[in-house]
Design a protein with these regions (language model features):
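Short, flexible loop/hinge motifs at secondary-structure junctions
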Residues: 1-23, 180, 407
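Trp/Phe/Arg-rich N-terminal binding region typifying the photolyase-homology
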Residues: 3-4, 53-67, 74, 78-119
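Hydrophobic alpha-helical scaffolding
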Residues: 19, 23, 32, 119, ...
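Basic, short loop/linker segments at the boundary and entry of helix-turn-helix/winged-helix-like folds
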Residues: 23-73, 78
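A short glycine/serine-rich beta->alpha loop
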Residues: 54-61, 251, 372-375
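Polybasic low-complexity intrinsically disordered regions
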Residues: 64, 88-91, 101-102, 107-305, ...
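Basic, amphipathic alpha-helical segments enriched in Lys/Arg and hydrophobic/aromatic residues
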Residues: 259, 343-436, 440, 448-454
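Helix-centered, glycine/charged polyanion-binding patches within enzymatic domains
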Residues: 290-376, 402
């Protein structure tokens, strides 16, 4: 074999036959995912859903809704947190272009087009897409929803603390600090002196009643999990404790109290389950002690929700003389369920599954920080991340693989074989460059055969 040399200068071809264009064998995971979406007529559903928000005849054709939504799925599966990085990744991969339904000569959508499409479509479209994915799970018999676990986490906003201004005067933090320094006797302080004064002054507090970010007024000053103070939102998940599917994902301001949002999230989960065609209704709501209050216990019982929520530690015994009998009954019923063996088991299961959903969506899925502004746009992006995570869970339950990054090493080889066993596809050739050869995997009468050549 002769040595091939890379051409330093290359003259572009004027004409290229379509048969000479680069072809991709496709990625096994994305191929299986496309098959699942096609089985449920995903493209027809989203095209009909998005049609009212586009002109019926005039104008340049937009990104097909099915392509746009698949690109948001790619963002989750590849751990990409911005439209620019998603567009670059799709343009760089032939297997992803095939997943999007683009031919070898078709350009991938630009990141600006993705952003404009995201802004054009209302939140209701993203909510119905989220419900569609749940409906896919229900058709496969994977969705229950009788017992849900609820918890929340912070999502860092696309806004800086350095840009906050006072609501009454519109002055920034620096001007406000200069005013305080002048009142304290420091005339014309330098930047270093002003920074030192601000760091040492007592009673320093940033209240959301007095301060806001002009670029994203919906973001609030929030204490993050790591102890820092940032402008952020609060994402709340309700997870089906039997299937590990997220049945509700709501977004709130960073300072929204857990006790004020838990019932709304539980009701939203019930609505989504009904829209998905689930035969079961939400019966048990499991949460941590941060969600416990008399109001929550009473309202949950009125809505026929059984709560398993531990009580906060109190230094004194509770008094019931000034409370309604229904409130006392609801609190005691919750206490009995929480202390039972079943309640303890559900609490442990909630901690495992809900925290796992945050790890997948926010940490590995790129959702810990948002590049959108405004609670509506942030909600739309988070709904797509959660819908992608549900797709991942469905794929894992159907064929054992929930992520394209799972297909690595020997385990990935065996899981790839399982995908082809399930779908009865043609023999699959897997190149093994590190071994200097390839492996053929074939399915004949439900019997797996493989051979290697070097």
């Amino acid at each position: 074999m002769a040595l091939g040399k890379r051409k330093r200068e290359r003259q572009l071809d004027a004409f290229v036959a379509s048969s000479d264009l680069p072809q991709s064998p496709g990625h096994p995971f994305y191929t299986a995912l496309n098959r699942l979406l096609a089985e449920n007529d995903f493209d027809s559903f989203v095209e009909e859903l998005c049609a009212p928000y586009y002109a019926s005849s005039m104008g340049r054709p937009s990104i097909p809704p099915g392509v746009f939504l698949r690109m948001t799925f790619v963002g989750y599966f590849e751990g990409l947190d911005s439209h620019r990085s998603i567009a670059w990744r799709c343009a760089d991969s032939r297997s992803l272009a095939e997943f999007l339904g683009l031919g070898p000569a078709d350009p991938t959508p630009d990141h600006s087009s993705i952003s404009k499409t995201h802004k054009r479509l209302p939140k209701e479209v993203f909510e119905q897409v989220f419900q569609f994915i749940l409906r896919v799970a229900a058709r496969k018999g994977l969705l229950s929803g009788k017992k849900i676990g609820i918890d929340s986490t912070t999502v860092q906003a696309n806004a800086s603390m350095k840009s906050i201004v006072r609501k009454d005067s519109g002055k920034g933090w620096k001007d406000y600090t200069k005013k305080l320094a002048k009142e304290a006797g420091l005339d014309a302080p330098t930047a270093a002196e002003l920074q030192q004064f601000d760091r040492k002054r007592k009673g320093k507090k940033v209240s959301n009643d007095e301060w806001e970010n002009p670029h994203d007024p919906d973001a609030t000053v929030t204490r993050m999990k790591n102890g820092t103070t940032r402008l952020a939102y609060k994402a709340e998940h309700a997870v089906d404790l039997e299937s590990d599917l997220i049945v509700s994902a709501t977004m709130h301001t960073g300072i929204a109290a857990d006790t004020e949002t838990v019932i709304d999230t539980a009701v939203d989960a019930a609505v989504n389950l009904e829209a998905a065609g689930s035969e079961d209704e939400v019966k048990t709501v499991v949460a941590d002690k941060g969600y416990h209050s008399n109001k929550v216990m009473t309202l949950a019982e009125e809505l026929n929700f059984e709560t398993v929520i531990p009580e906060r530690d109190t230094p004194t015994n509770r008094r019931w003389s000034d409370k309604e009998p229904a409130t006392k009954r609801a609190v005691y019923n919750n206490r009995r369920r929480t202390k039972s063996e079943r309640g303890k088991k559900l609490s442990r299961l909630r901690s495992e599954l809900v925290e796992r959903s945050f790890a997948h969506v926010c940490d590995t899925g790129g959702g810990r920080r948002t590049w959108h502004r405004g609670i509506v746009n942030v909600t739309k992006r988070h709904l797509m991340l959660v819908a992608s995570r549900n797709l991942s869970t469905i794929m894992r339950m159907l064929c054992g693989i929930g992520s394209p990054r799972t297909l690595q090493g020997l385990r990935g080889l065996l899981q790839t074989a399982w995908i082809h066993i399930q779908s009865h596809v043609q023999p699959l050739k897997i190149d093994m460059p590190q071994w200097g050869g390839h492996i053929w995997i074939a399915v004949t009468d439900l019997r797996l055969t493989w051979s290697a050549s070097w």
